[in-house]
């Protein structure tokens, strides 16, 4: 489960309840939503939802 998401100018960092961290390049994206299981970013008019290990779950027009 996701504990929190932090970000800097280049990366999103997903920290789990077990203390594990996964990272993903921002590449002009912004964080729009997160909960304990998934997180969603918006980039160039599309939304991308990922799990705690930064695996893509779904994408759609935003």
Tell where the protein language model's regions lie, with residue ranges.
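Structured surface patches comprising rigid loops and adjacent beta-strands/short helices at the edges
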Residues: 27-32, 36
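Short beta-strand elements that form the blades of beta-propeller/WD-repeat-like
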Residues: 1-7, 12-14, 35-49
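Surface-exposed loop/turn elements that mediate protein-protein interactions on large endomembrane-trafficking
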Residues: 11-27, 49-61
């Amino acid at each position: 489960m996701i504990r929190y998401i932090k970000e800097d100018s280049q990366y999103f960092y997903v920290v789990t309840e077990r203390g594990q961290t996964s990272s993903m390049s921002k590449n002009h994206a912004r964080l729009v939503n997160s909960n304990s299981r998934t997180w969603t970013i918006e980039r160039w008019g599309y939304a991308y939802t990922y799990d705690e290990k930064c695996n893509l779950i779904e994408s759609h027009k935003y």
